[in-house]
From Swiss-Prot:
Binding site for substrate: 18-23
Lineage of source species: Bacteria, Pseudomonadati, Pseudomonadota, Alphaproteobacteria, Hyphomicrobiales
HAMAP family: IPP_trans
Site (Interaction with substrate tRNA): 107, 129
Cofactors, names only: Mg(2+)
Any Gene Ontology biological process: tRNA modification
Keyword Transferase: yes
Any one GO MF annotation of this record: tRNA dimethylallyltransferase activity
Species this chain originates from: Allorhizobium ampelinum (strain ATCC BAA-846 / DSM 112012 / S4)
UniProt-listed Enzyme Commission number(s): 2.5.1.75
Nucleotide-binding among keywords: yes
Protein's recorded name: tRNA dimethylallyltransferase
Origin superkingdom: Bacteria
Catalytic activity: adenosine(37) in tRNA + dimethylallyl diphosphate = N(6)-dimethylallyladenosine(37) in tRNA + diphosphate
């Protein structure tokens, strides 16, 4: 079933929940077709968190070229638009080299933007971002939601009053443009990859096997440098609002370093959080990825 994947396709796209074996599948397919692997995971872009975010090993990255892994400093914001621009540059280079991109990751929005275009959002000055994050810390998300309700009731009605991230995003656009974020959400930029010219795979493993992998993986991470990575991250004194600080395992290991919980608690809590995240991903993929996305069982295809 996996033979001749490069025939008549401009790219191979692989998504699926965390710990599903999609990275191993991407590595194998890229090696088979002489392609390169491109990251589509919003946490694996950060430099400090190689182990915690389960980036490919150095051995794998040497076996096949890998791009957009660990290229963003932990203290920087990195949006879907930033990722899309980086991918567009890469794809131009790969086309000139006649090499097939194998794009893999669990961030569904990246794939939606890649194949369907991204809403044409305005640039937000850092000062506005900082101001609104500070307001959320002091006043709370529900206070910001009340503000949004007064200024943009239609959008506010769609948002959970506790969803600080989306509330802040809507307020950022209002602050900078004076217009509702909904105005910009209806404007889509060009697609980067024609979905009809891509082989699209969703890795959907057996639930029990996935949970077993998750439970084993975090214990291994603790032995392979996860604690040291989190220590290095905490030493940067970053705002808790930064995406890198929200990676699963960071808050749990930080609590252990403070003496609040044990190593065993870290493994249990982080594994539970990862299982919940994988469940949300599985639901999203089943609902958002239509029949043109081929469902793949990693065990049946020996993808690891």
């Amino acid at each position: 079933m996996m033979n001749n994947l490069d025939d008549n396709f401009d790219a191979i796209l692989i998504t699926g929940p965390t710990a599903s074996g999609k990275s191993a599948l991407a590595l194998r397919l890229a090696a088979e077709v002489g392609g390169v692997v491109i990251n589509a995971d919003s946490m694996q872009v950060y430099d400090t968190l190689r182990v915690v975010t389960a980036r490919p090993s150095e051995e794998d990255m040497q076996a096949v070229p890998h791009h957009l892994y660990g290229h963003v400093v932990a203290g920087a914001a990195y949006s879907t638009g930033d990722w899309l621009r980086d991918v567009a540059v890469l794809l131009q280079d790969l086309q000139a080299q006649n090499r097939l991109p194998v794009i893999v990751g669990g961030t569904g929005l990246y794939f939606k933007a890649l194949t369907g275009g991204l809403s044409d959002m305005p640039a937000i000055p850092e000062a506005v971002r900082v101001m609104l994050r500070q307001r959320e810390r002091v006043e709370g998300a529900e206070s910001l939601h009340r503000d949004l309700t007064l200024r943009d009731p239609t959008v506010a009605a769609r948002l959970d009053p506790r969803d600080g991230q989306r509330i802040i995003r809507a307020l950022e656009v209002l602050e900078v443009t004076g217009q509702s974020i909904s105005v910009f959400q209806t404007r889509s930029g060009p697609m980067i990859i024609d979905p009809q010219r891509a082989r699209k795979l969703v890795v959907l493993p057996d639930r029990k096997l996935l949970h077993d992998r998750i439970n084993r993986r975090f214990a291994m991470m603790m032995d392979e440098g996860a604690v040291e990575e989190v220590e290095a991250l905490l030493a940067q004194n970053l705002s808790l609002d930064m995406p890198a600080m929200k990676a699963i395992g960071v808050s749990q290991i930080a609590a252990m370093l403070k003496g609040e919980i044990s190593r065993e608690d870290v493994i249990e809590k982080s594994s539970a959080a990862t299982r919940q995240y994988a469940k949300r991903q599985m639901t999203w993929f089943r609902n958002q990825m239509n029949e043109t996305w081929e469902r793949v069982d990693p065990a049946a295809n020996r993808s690891g």
